[in-house]
């Protein structure tokens, strides 16, 4: 990540909106924003393979559900945050991931400029590709600051997106069970 370019760009934005980039409260802002971007975009170029490849053998194939995984990310359209909760269900095929690995999977894909629909897809596909799940079902509910603080200005509006892979695509009863276990 080119922090010098980020700092220069932020300084130009400060000046472009009519502020003095050299006043006390803004002098360090370009450097702070560059450090923040290093942190919140740390998922760029990464996948969840390293997290989901560390799995444990299991003899049954009962559904695993982890819900209310908090995340925050940046909308790629306005570079404003959106945040919320991810709910994950999957059917193992002989192996299960450690529970923290599901949260880490959400984190990896949320640490980059993102849209909610793609975040859903990337998490579900990672469970299928790297864990070898028989099925994956991901629901994300989020509030988007681009809707809350600008434009339509409707704070508190939740957007829900879902994606189903494998067994969840074809088995409505399985999806319904996942919804119930997720409390949705």
Swiss-Prot record:
Binding-site list for Zn(2+): 75, 78, 146
Record GO biological process: one-carbon metabolic process; tetrahydrobiopterin biosynthetic process; tetrahydrofolate biosynthetic process
Keyword Thylakoid among UniProt keywords: no
Pathway info: Cofactor biosynthesis; 7,8-dihydroneopterin triphosphate biosynthesis; 7,8-dihydroneopterin triphosphate from GTP: step 1/1
Pfam families associated with the record: GTP_cyclohydroI
UniProt KW keywords: GTP-binding, Hydrolase, Metal-binding, Nucleotide-binding, One-carbon metabolism, Zinc
Entries under PROSITE patterns matching the protein: GTP_CYCLOHYDROL_1_1, GTP_CYCLOHYDROL_1_2
Enzyme Commission numbers on file: 3.5.4.16
Catalytic reaction equation(s): GTP + H2O = 7,8-dihydroneopterin 3'-triphosphate + formate + H(+)
Family annotation (InterPro entries): GTP-CH-I_C/QueF (IPR043133), GTP-CH-I_N (IPR043134), GTP_CycHdrlase_I (IPR001474), GTP_CycHdrlase_I_CS (IPR018234), GTP_CycHdrlase_I_dom (IPR020602)
GO MF annotations, alphabetized: GTP binding; GTP cyclohydrolase I activity; zinc ion binding
This protein's GO CC annotations: cytoplasm
HAMAP family, sorted: FolE (MF_00223)
Quaternary organization: Toroid-shaped homodecamer, composed of two pentamers of five dimers.
Family to which this protein belongs: Belongs to the GTP cyclohydrolase I family.
Identification of the protein by name: GTP cyclohydrolase 1
Originating gene: folE
């Amino acid at each position: 990540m080119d922090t010098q370019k980020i700092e220069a760009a932020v300084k130009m934005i400060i000046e472009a909106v009519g502020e003095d980039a050299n006043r006390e409260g803004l002098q360090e802002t370009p450097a702070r924003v560059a450090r923040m971007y290093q942190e919140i975009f740390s998922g760029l170029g990464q996948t969840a393979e390293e997290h989901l490849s560390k799995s444990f053998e299991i003899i049954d194939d009962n559904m695993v559900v982890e819900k209310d995984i908090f995340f925050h990310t940046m909308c790629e359209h306005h570079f404003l945050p959106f945040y919320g909760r991810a709910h994950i269900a999957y059917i193992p095929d002989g192996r299960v991931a450690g529970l923290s690995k599901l949260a880490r999977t959400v984190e990896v894909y949320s640490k980059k400029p993102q849209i909610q629909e793609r975040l859903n897809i990337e998490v579900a596909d990672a469970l299928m590709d790297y864990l070898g799940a028989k099925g994956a079902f991901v629901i994300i509910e989020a509030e988007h600051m681009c809707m809350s603080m600008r434009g339509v200005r409707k704070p508190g509006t939740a957007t829900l997106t879902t994606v189903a892979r494998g067994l969840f695509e074809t088995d409505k009863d399985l999806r319904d069970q996942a919804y119930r276990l997720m409390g949705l």
